[in-house]
Amino acid sequence: MDLQTALAEIKRGTEEILIEDELVEKLKSGKKLKIKAGFDPTAPDLHLGHTVLINKMKTFQDLGHEVVFLIGDFTGMIGDPTGKNVTRKPLTREDVLANAETYKEQVFKILDPAKTTVAFNSTWMENLGAAGMIKLAARQTVARMLERDDFKKRYASGQSIAIHEFLYPLVQGWDSVALEADVELGGTDQRFNLLMGRELQKDEGQKPQTVIMTPLLEGTDGVQKMSKSLGNYIGITDAPNDMFGKIMSISDVLMWRYYDLLSGLSIAGINAQKERVEQGTNPRDIKIELAKELIARFHSEADAQAAHDDFIQRFQKKALPDEIPELTVTIEQDSILIANLLKEANLVASTSEAMRMIKQGAVKLNGEDKITDTKLEIAKGSTAIYQVGKRKFANITVA
């Protein structure tokens, strides 16, 4: 693969590269680069949002570079404060190691285990000792740490910041020194920590790593980042039928975002899919191909085909129209009453009409389940097809 094509694949779906010219020079050198991406095993199950970064690791792996999957068993016991307005509860060593094993099983559904180096940052951090940690802490100031957005907000609002939380970016940066990383991958929310690695490498006389930031993947609601707590996630260990249904529930616009960040298709392949839609192919068919690809990756080709067959059978049984309006209803609370949701979506003229239709059994969820509870609360982050009567349909996301 020529340099320009390789660079285009690396840049695909990335948010920012610091510094791109440095990356180009590293690629031109012909040297096998060491690509680092760190994961704190704070939760045992991965969802598709996590795989955006792992897919980028796979890109580098396919280009012949050395990929280091760094399990932050040491940092996991500190607790990453990124994006949090409260101090995270640290995990026990037993929790961290158990979660790390689950992580490895899951990432090797994407990465080639024979070409992946799995490292644990406790290897060097425990050897650093108390004196080494104090010397490391002396490299930065409290003022510098307070430049981090989450720390800044907590400090301004009078919320406590534990001293150990200031150490987290330094430890992550020191990982890059220990590994002599050429490139570090991370989400946009990790910017401060990733740049810390560059600073510490310079201090140690190493060439600073190139930082590549990937975006945070939106969940099935198309609004907020994919998260278990928001209920808008697609787990890579989800049952094939569940995964298929969730992928089919995303909007046609979000589908292309998922293709960009999750699909193994080349840029040319994705452009060919877009061309098919422009020439009249139903976007639903393109979405089906994406669902089958992802299920085959995390389960098997047979599971993907079975999930597809099940979906088609259920879809035809429901007799839903091919084109259903997609809309988002934004709420401030954690849930919305079903009658209010139907009114907001213009499926009924009033909440009283909604209540009446529910009592008559004329409101269905996803084409088959009748809604009979007038007090039903619909959770924020959910996406479903709502039907009122025989002719009114809407694919509604509550955000």
From Swiss-Prot:
Its main location: cytoplasm. Signal peptide: none annotated. Keywords: Aminoacyl-tRNA synthetase, ATP-binding, Cytoplasm, Ligase, Nucleotide-binding, Protein biosynthesis, RNA-binding. It is found in: Cytoplasm. Coiled coil: none annotated. Its EC number is 6.1.1.1. Residues 336-398 form the S4 RNA-binding domain. A motif ('KMSKS' region) lies at residues 225-229. One of its GO terms (molecular function) is tyrosine-tRNA ligase activity. CDD domains: S4, TyrRS_core. NCBIfam families: tyrS (TIGR00234). Homodimer. This is Tyrosine--tRNA ligase 2. It comes from Pseudoalteromonas translucida (strain TAC 125). The gene is tyrS2.
